[in-house]
Amino acid sequence: LAVEHSNVHQQKHFTTRAFDSLICIIAPASFIELAEATLIGWRFVEQKSSLAKSDIIVAYRDNLFHVDSTVLDNPKVVDDLLDALNEFFLCLSYLLANKTQEFSLLHCASYTEAGKNIILLGDKKSGKSAKTLSKTIAGELIYADDLLLWHAKRGIFVALGLPLRLRRTMIPLIDSDTVKDKFIIGKNILYSHQNFFNNAKLGDEFLLDQLKLMSENFDFAIKDIPVYKTLFYLKQHLIAGNFISIKNILQK
């Protein structure tokens, strides 16, 4: 997704609040507008005065996007707007898990199927996104296609309000041009527009009815996980603590 250099890249100060946790952001207003057009249930408020601290900084210079955060070891530098948005969403998710403390972050897809709440586990590129896409097109409620919050003590799962993300190589799986028009297409990935699909918003809670696992053979086969093995498999797919830990203080 090409971006022309202009004043739209001037950085401004924003805050967003989720689960009583405040996240402070410095970023171009146009970038935040795009985030708001794809995220579900998030609200960003521009601050008239400079923030005393920041959790995420997004900058555009030398034709590159620079995304830095207190949860990153080093800034992420990419040349495509949607790739930058992807890094931004990851930082939001990691920060939310860090700031709330009560949630773990689960790598999974999650959706409804025949009235049941499903969580689908699997390795990267095992077929979770393809399965989620088929459920999306079928009109099912999508809780997550990559990351989900888990409150183990309460036994509930909570949506992050992230849009559907697809690799560009998955475009051939979308037969309908009408469906394609509901995605923002970047150099490497696609993001769904807000409100075009039945995506759960930030904070939507649900109980698990069935845990499923993609085949390790990458043949798109799916098996049901018995109840007594649920906890074991969930723990195997948690995002490691080093991803959500605070690593540095950002310099404005």
Specify the residue positions occupied by each region the protein language model found.
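Glycine-rich, often acidic-flanked micro-motifs
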Residues: 1-14, 21-22, 28-37, 41, ...
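N-terminal pre-Walker A segment at the start of P-loop NTPase domains
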Residues: 82-105
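Short, solvent-exposed cationic patches
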Residues: 47, 99, 141
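Post-Walker A alpha-helix
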Residues: 131-132
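Long, basic/Gly/Ser/Thr-rich N-terminal segments
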Residues: 1-85
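Conserved glycine(s) of the Walker
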Residues: 126-128
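Short, glycine/charge-rich beta-strand/loop segments that flank catalytic centers
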Residues: 50-63, 104-114, 149
